[in-house]
């Protein structure tokens, strides 16, 4: 007999499965719905010591969590070039390197290895900087607790932080094997597995409240050390992702190719006048037969739930850490925020 969780997963999958064509977009960890969903879960899990405005801002944080992928739009050439490396780190290209807590020192070390930094990526640095950006904004809030502009800024920055943290928790964002096992020249065969994994939070049904129950939320004494530890744990799951690939492809097989358009018929002799032709037979009414989607294997459901919980826990811990560390920030003497109009 199937475990009740497996039954729930299989039954709800028939309702929630999405067309495979939706996966034909550039790689972005967890997709739009997934990034927003896990960011909001992290905010809702925060303890009371985090300010009320922030705990009430889950929706806005989720909306902002999508922004970093918008910044990679192909029409924004300069912004795309700067933003794209912020979303990944191909760890194999820097094996054995001790990562400094400075993106430019890191870039210099990568260049010493005669590797293009754009191929490596700087995901841990985009996340570290996002944490520090939120920390400073929380420090502003401590000084100007009624300033709604600062509160809204904190929610936006929190969304960006959640995006980069979510990318780090997607194992294929940490590896040269990001879309199929890398070819000998380290290029990607682009097999489509990246899109399958990115869609898990969106396409696999699970009980979010149950998955995030008693979510562990830490205060990290050293954010940089914590980021590297989380990066290592995520990277260690790359092989597991590839072990799950057959199950994912069973759940979401490739969409069938559209039927070829028939060639126009060769003109024939003129038809007889309408009044000399017999009336056509009534057209048969086609019967629509819904093809049920294949079930989602329990192995994929379990992996999705584990990743969602780990990601929400990591994001919430970074939020709590940013709040705690903001207490030690001294705002510069030149900073004067205008008071809101009465």
Where are the model-predicted features located?
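Bacterial N-terminal signal peptides that target proteins for export
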Residues: 1-14
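Cleavable N-terminal signal peptides
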Residues: 16-17, 22, 27
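N-terminal, motif-rich segments that launch catalysis or mediate targeting to/interaction with membranes
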Residues: 26-160, 171-342
